[in-house]
Every structure is written in structure tokens, then in C-alpha cells.
Amino acid sequence: MDFSTPVLKHVEKHIQHRIHFMNTTVYQSSRYKGGAYTTSHLIFNPKIGKFEILVNASVSFGNELNKTFEELGFNSLPSADDLEKDTKDVNETGRKYLLEAYAGLKVKRAGVYAGILDTTSFFDTNEYANDEQNQFLNTDLVNNPLAVLPSYNPGLILNLNLSHNFSLQFGWAQGDPDTESVYLMQFGFSSEDYHVYFYYTHSPFEEVKSLGISSDYTFENLGFFFRFGKNNLEDYKYFVSGGSVLNLGKEEIGFGYAFRKGNKLKDVNVLEIYFKHVLSSYLHITFDYQLIDDVRNTYVLGFRLNFEY
């Protein structure tokens, strides 16, 4: 298998264009309030031989439930999307709308990527719980919340295919706005049916160290995923998540559960169920239900309309 290519998040596998457009509109309602947001991405990804570039620009309108949940002190948020506050001032750097812009070169069994990039396209990837526009919406069911995995910052990634099944990855990225430099390492084992990744991150400036496991398994039309995370901070002892996704052709049903074991902070439980219906090759709708037990306990009902071309 080829491990030297990053995961192109949000993009459905059957849609591969040099210029790719997607729009996601989401309405969510909870016991606190309801509201909608819309986010659009324009991705330019030309490939010439072994060389490629990727540019990902995004415009969003609305922050909706995430803003309310943050004000209430929630640590688990109902949407992992890049919202208006995220795209108008990316990582508090003053940069607007440009999320990714990097170049990549593949040579034999290696791939090198440099520029403004998202480390979650390389580390902690997962077949069934890694894409808030097509899969689960909640932040705890998209990536490991205890790992230091910077997004949309300058970085450098080296991917190595050790063999047909084994991979090794090294990375460096700026950690704005939370920390300075972050160093990453990941070892992976994969086949056509399953993937297992073990990774470690270290931010020397604040001495934040984290480790994690991300794995998935496919059996016919049924998929399973599992994550584990831990860091050296005192807020949580560990994080674990898991679930399954049933593919019925034009329909998809996902069930996921995530748990943070509290230490200084309260335990966090997240349950999410979604039902996705494909209307066409470029359009699908999703009905989503979340239970979030954090600083408070609430439900979140959601509807997502996604268009890609």
C-alpha cells in the first residue's frame, strides 16, 4: 500500500478533480439554542509526475452552537467544522481563508510535504471517524482531543513506506495558537481491510507530550474504528473512542462513543448517531443526534447538507 500520500480530508474518494469545490450547511439544535452555519472549501490539487501542490481555501458563515458551548465551558463541541471565527483569523495569525498551501514530492518509497498543512491529514487518520463533513460531527469523534495535532500551520512531513504494510512518518509543525513547535512521529501497519497507527507528539516549549492509537477495520459493508489517547497534562487521564459504520449503498448509518476520563476536569461522555442518505454522486443529506455529558448534559439534533464537485 502507498503510505506516502496524505489523506485528502472531506473529499469523497469517487470525486477526484484538480479543482474541487464543496459546501456543507449544518443546522443544529440543543436545549440551549439552535442555529445554522455554512462552510465552503475550494481545493486546488494538481499533480505533475511525482510532484504535487495542494491549496485549500475556505469561507464560512456562522459559529452557532460551538460558540454557545464554548461560553458554557464545554470541552467537547458539537461540530469539528472550520467555522467563521476559524477561517477569518486562522489560528489567530491574521491570515484569512487560506487553510492549506503546501507542496509534495514522492520519490520511490518516500513522500516529503512542506508548507502550510494540516497534521491530521497525516497523523491520527481513520477510515470511519476523521471527516466532519461526511462522517461524525462531534470533535471527540473526528480526532484524538488529547493529542497535540496542529492544523493549518507551517510544517514539514516525511512519509516513509517501509514495506507493503508498514509505514513510518516524521513531522514538525508550528503549534499556533496554543504552543510553539510540535514534533510528531507515527508508525503504521495497514492492509486492504484494516489500519493501525501508533503516534507520539511532543511540544518542547510547554513540555506537552501525547501519544495515541487510531485503528479501523472493514468487514464487507461494516466498518469499525477505535482510538486511544493520553498526554502528560492533568486535565484528563486518558481518552478512548470507538464505534461502527454500516454502509447500505445509498444509505450509511454511523454509531460512535467517546469518553475522556477526568482528573482535574469532569469525565466527558459523547454519543453520536448519524444517518446519511446519498441523493446523487455530488449531494447527500445527514440526520445527526448527539448526547454530550460534559460540564453539563445536553442533546444536539443536527441536519447536514453536503455538496461536492
Curated annotation (Swiss-Prot):
InterPro entries: OprB_sf. Belongs to the OprB family. This is Uncharacterized protein aq_1256.
